[in-house]
């Protein structure tokens, strides 16, 4: 967890592969001591998802969920994996439950991340109206949310240039490497990934 935070906040000079290898090694050691440690399975699920190993991400997410089915962090992590692997209804059920149980996650000051997870889920469900509805509950946009919301607006034939997301895109993210950014969305379907990348690069 600490290694992941260091990487995403820019506090580590190690490259991504080194950090993930070290994180996995540490978690594996912890699992050797206690194979029923749900935190280890939860974190391994996240590590495998980041490496696009969706089978193992789902496997460890399920193990954590079976141990503590009402932990919001487990619900959120496992739900994120399921919506990506085609089990959208179940994934959304878990993401909505995480939001209901713990709308503002520990250590955070808003419900943005929970809502962004729901945006991801409803995007995969192709419920574009719900994606746009949720967009108004996000206070700080990130590249993933911008791409998913703008894509959803386009599917609803809305004027993109009038949206908050378009303005943030042009002011804060105009230099974004979208190939790299979309890869970090960890989308299993190559068709969906390509369509989204083509769309956002053309906006």
Where are the model-predicted features located?
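Non-membrane alpha-helical segments in proteins
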Residues: 1-12, 46
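A generic tandem-repeat structural signature
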Residues: 27, 35-52
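Alpha-helical protein-protein interaction modules
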Residues: 9, 17, 24-28, 40, ...
């Amino acid at each position: 967890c600490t290694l992941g935070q260091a990487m995403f906040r820019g506090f580590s000079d190690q490259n991504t592969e080194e950090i993930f290898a070290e994180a996995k090694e540490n978690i594996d050691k912890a699992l050797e001591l206690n194979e029923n440690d749900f935190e280890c399975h939860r974190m391994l699920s996240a590590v495998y998802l980041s490496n696009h190993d969706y089978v193992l991400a789902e496997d460890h997410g399920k193990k954590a969920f079976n141990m503590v089915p009402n932990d919001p962090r487990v619900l959120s992590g496992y739900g994120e994996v399921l919506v990506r692997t085609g089990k959208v209804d179940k994934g959304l059920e878990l993401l909505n439950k995480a939001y209901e149980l713990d709308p503002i996650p520990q250590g955070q000051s808003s419900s943005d991340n929970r809502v962004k997870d729901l945006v991801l889920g409803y995007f995969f469900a192709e419920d574009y109206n719900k994606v746009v509805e949720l967009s108004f509950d996000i206070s700080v946009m990130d590249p993933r949310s911008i791409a998913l919301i703008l894509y959803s607006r386009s599917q609803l034939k809305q004027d993109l240039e009038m949206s908050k997301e378009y303005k943030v895109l042009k002011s804060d993210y105009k230099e974004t490497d979208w190939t790299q950014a979309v890869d970090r969305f960890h989308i299993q379907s190559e068709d969906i990934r390509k369509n989204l990348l083509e769309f956002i690069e053309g906006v």
